[in-house]
Amino acid sequence: MDFRSLIASSVAQDKDREFEVRPSSRGSWSCKEVDEFDALSIEYEPKPIEKYPAKLHARQVKKYLGLQEGLIYLPGLPSFNYEDSDMQPAFRQRRYFYYLTGVNFPDCIVTYSIHRDQLWLWIPPPNSGRSVIYNGSRPTAKEIMAKYDLDHVETLPHLDSYLTWYAHTEPGKIHVLHDYQTPNNVELQITRKNGSQSIMSESPFDSTKLEEAMNTARAIKSPYELKMIRKASAITAQGHINVLRGLRYLSNEAEIEAIFTATCIARQAKTQAYGVIAGSGENASTLHYMANNEPLKGRQLLCLDAGCEWDCYASDVTRTVPISGEYTEEAQAIYDLVAKMQDECIEMLKPGANYRDVHMHAHKVALRGLMELGLVEGGTFNELYMAGVSVAFFPHGLGHYVGLEVHDVGPGGMIITNRLFDFNRKPADWTDAYFQILSDSGINSGGGAILSKDMVVTVEPGIYFSRYALEEVYLKSPKYAKYINKELLQKYYPVGGVRIEDDLLITEDGYENLTTAPKGEAALKIINEGREQEEKRVVCEKAAESKRKQKKTWFW
């Protein structure tokens, strides 16, 4: 195959496409002016499909790579079956691949020529026979070109020869995310002439640069990506609202999960960004509780952490509410404290802010509140703060990036506070490791905690009463036990835990809250309106049943 001619042809087609579409600003199609007697010759131009901005994303990656030549090589997820089965799991595309294509079907590979600015998708050959009968036809190259922001679509059988050709004739390395994603069937070594001698050079593949460049690019959301996150957030909000409406007459955590997921599926959001967390009572103290199978009766609070995906983009929302529609004194105190933590931290968000500082402010607010409630005591605020006592009640990071992953990537990987957690550490070391953040100036290398315009992050403070954490770790440690009011804890264990979480877009001079799910008084109002409606429904049913009995008696 003549790849140079193919490249030249795709470049020409790319230039032609720039002038194909002229969308109207006043509707879904635009009309050319015609004489009223010439109506049969009316021409119109359909509104163009809004394509996923794959080329924009590829150019962003090029920018952060800092290279003017080379090739990016990214395989999508291959299709596969469960072990010892002929059934396939639900498909979930590799997110780095999706970021450069918007393509959400298996067995494809994308390449991007940095110096030619050419984005090519490599697809399996057309399927036929029983495969079509069972699974339908694969999209054709023509269909893909019409739908996606690509320069060319080619079939996979030509890929190996293309990569070999590229390695021998084009400048720069072939960049892969991971060594294991390097293609196996390519002539990896390049033979070059040095005078009369043939010298074998190094492999043309490089796995040291691409991941960090893509992480940095993915942290800054394009307008299209923000639109997807807003859509996911809107559907998620409706799921939370429907749970609130029915909460008073639900009996099990499983019903909460069912209502939320059904709401999302009915709105075409068929995938959850993560497993639904519907923890009631003390289950709310388990951060990633997902059993969702226990009764609600007799329990104070529900912590519902749930968010759907829309076209692979996540939302992440947590609401904590009283199951009865009314807070106990202890639950109200903890909810108010967490709400204060969140409100103050959100107000700190803006470009240039260090998320580490926001995170530590949450601990300061938490500690003051816990001291006022008498849950921690026996020292000054500064003494208790430097000891890290608040971590016993607030043991996780304040937030994370949101995007193609619910815990999305950014400069340096994930957001800075997540780097502190090593599940291999001994429990007694957790707090010491956590508070290294106060003194380790090097932990912010790579700028992962510095907020920038168009980042999306969560702010999700929480206060928890985990029996295991408190009784097996902190109360057994002389360093922390002296500060914790063990007797008062007994009153707060039934609260379980409170977490409140919103998704925030960093704007030019501050933030925008993308989360519209009700919280606080607005959530309570929905719960209690649901209770009133249920009570009216029961009264109506009883009245109808009474009338039926009266008619039956009269008839006989």
From Swiss-Prot:
Cofactor note: Binds 2 manganese ions per subunit.
Superkingdom to which the source organism belongs: Eukaryota
Entry EC number(s): 3.4.11.9
SMART domains reported in the protein's UniProt record: AMP_N
Residues annotated for Mn(2+) 1 binding in this entry: 316, 460, 501
Record's keyword annotation contains S-adenosyl-L-methionine: no
Residues holding Mn(2+) 2: 305, 316, 501
InterPro entries referenced in this protein's UniProt entry, alphabetically: Aminopep_P_N, Creatin/AminoP/Spt16_N, Creatinase/aminopeptidase-like, Pept_M24, Peptidase_M24B_aminopep-P_CS, X-Pro_dipept-like
Listed Pfam families: AMP_N (PF05195), Peptidase_M24 (PF00557)
Biological process according to GO: proteolysis
Family statement: Belongs to the peptidase M24B family.
Annotated protein name in UniProt: Probable Xaa-Pro aminopeptidase SS1G_06948
Organism: Sclerotinia sclerotiorum (strain ATCC 18683 / 1980 / Ss-1)
